[in-house]
Regions:
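Metal-dependent nuclease catalytic cores that hydrolyze phosphodiester bonds in DNA/RNA
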Residues: 1-214
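Short acidic (Asp/Glu) and glycine-rich catalytic loops that position anionic groups and cofactors
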Residues: 29-33, 235-240, 291-294
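Short amphipathic alpha-helical face segments that pack within enzyme cores
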Residues: 51, 218, 254-262
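Hydrophobic/aromatic-lined pockets within catalytic cores
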Residues: 56-61, 221, 236-239, 264-268
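Metal-dependent nuclease catalytic regions and adjoining charged, substrate-binding loops involved
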Residues: 91-106, 153, 245-253, 261-347
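Secondary-structure boundary elements
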Residues: 191-196, 221-229, 264-278
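Glycosyltransferase-associated regions of secretory-pathway enzymes
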Residues: 194, 207-216, 223, 332-347
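Non-catalytic protein-protein interaction segments used by genome-maintenance enzymes to assemble
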Residues: 204-253
Length: 347
């Protein structure tokens, strides 16, 4: 399995999000997204969700990506604009860079360059820690966000199910003899059968009837001894106690079933297993990011998928996307091209 292209950069493959674009906005929109003509949305809630995921699943990556600023932070959009202009300045002389940055954020009518420079120097001094941290390329985390992360982690650690599901990544080998134990202790595990694996942010490139697909699972546990795989997905929400609404609004069942398809392809094509011999579990670990910062774990059952017709919806969508990909016809639906131009409603 070739995953040399980072997940979010590979636009040649169909993700669960791509299926959502196709179902909600049609083939032309999907094609434009895949071609990079429509940028991805970036909202504060999405950015916060990414931060929480990384903090819980990739703590080392979190340290390399985020930084708590100990000094004063910008108090207005004008100060933030001043900082961004200053760190992106191509001016060689620092005084000119300061003046230009200040003028980009504030009106300097009636003020001399010397007066502007004095104001800019004072502001740069007040924000020096923030400027240095921003120049480092790391994302700045607020005091509140750090407290939020701590609250969520503590609540997960004290939750009797979430704490069992969200463990650090590991690989356990089968050891049938003392020499096998010695191999594990010395790290010479080549040739030893694997009993269990736990992966976070697990990237799978797979195929559906020749259509190139991709999935990025929050957490995947593979139990080779008992032939059971467990998918765990983290969700941040403000609807923790009526999470059913979020399940329907964001079509989380579709996402989880798509992950199941990816895992079963992976077991068969990459691990030499027959997925029909395997059982499965799916869990959603939902975290409230406001008020009490509670955590709830939801066990997704087989009946949930079938009651929602999830299987049919995904397979129908993939078949349609496959058809559009093969024919190159993206302006209208497959039904439009196959008939007289009229289309039916799924009422």
């Amino acid at each position: 399995m070739d995953i040399s292209i980072p997940y979010y950069e590979d636009m040649s493959r169909i993700s669960n999000s791509a299926i959502g674009w196709f179902l909600k906005k049609g083939p032309a929109f999907l094609r434009a997204k895949l071609d990079g003509k429509i940028p991805d949305e970036s909202t504060p809630s999405l950015e916060k969700g990414t931060m929480i995921h990384m903090y819980l699943l990739q703590p080392e990556e979190f340290v390399n990506t985020y930084k708590l600023c100990a000094g004063q932070k910008p108090k207005s959009t004008n100060q933030e604009r001043f900082v961004q202009e200053l760190i992106n300045s191509t001016e060689i002389e620092s005084d000119k860079a300061l003046i230009k940055a200040y003028k980009s954020a504030y009106s300097t009518v009636g003020r001399t360059d010397a007066e502007t420079l004095s104001k800019a120097q004072q502001m740069a001094l007040e924000l020096k820690d923030y400027i240095a941290d921003t120049r480092s390329g790391k994302k700045i985390v607020s005091d509140y966000d750090m407290r939020l992360l701590g609250w969520i982690k503590t609540n997960i650690d004290h939750h009797k199910m979430a704490s069992k599901l969200l463990r650090p990544e590991f690989t356990i080998y089968e050891t049938k003899a003392p020499e096998d134990e010695a191999k594990v202790l010395t790290g010479k595990t080549e040739g030893l059968p694997i009993a269990e694996e736990l992966h976070h942010e697990f990237h799978i490139n797979w195929e559906y009837k020749g259509l190139k697909c991709k999935s990025l699972l929050d957490s995947l546990h593979l139990d080779f001894k008992h032939k059971r795989y467990t998918i765990m997905d983290l969700k941040t929400t403000v609807k923790l106690y009526h999470f059913e609404d979020s399940m329907k609004e964001y079509d989380y069942l579709r996402q989880l079933y798509y992950y199941r398809m990816a895992v079963e392809w992976y077991l068969e094509h990459e691990r030499g297993e027959n997925p029909k011999d395997w059982d499965w579990d799916c869990f959603i670990i939902a975290m409230n990011t406001i008020e009490q910062k509670d955590v709830r774990v939801f066990h997704i059952l087989s009946s949930d998928f079938y009651n929602d017709n999830t299987t049919e919806r995904i397979e129908d969508a993939l078949e349609a996307i496959k058809w559009h990909t093969e024919t190159g016809q993206w302006e209208h639906s497959r039904e439009y091209y196959a008939g007289n131009g009229c289309e039916t409603l799924n009422l």
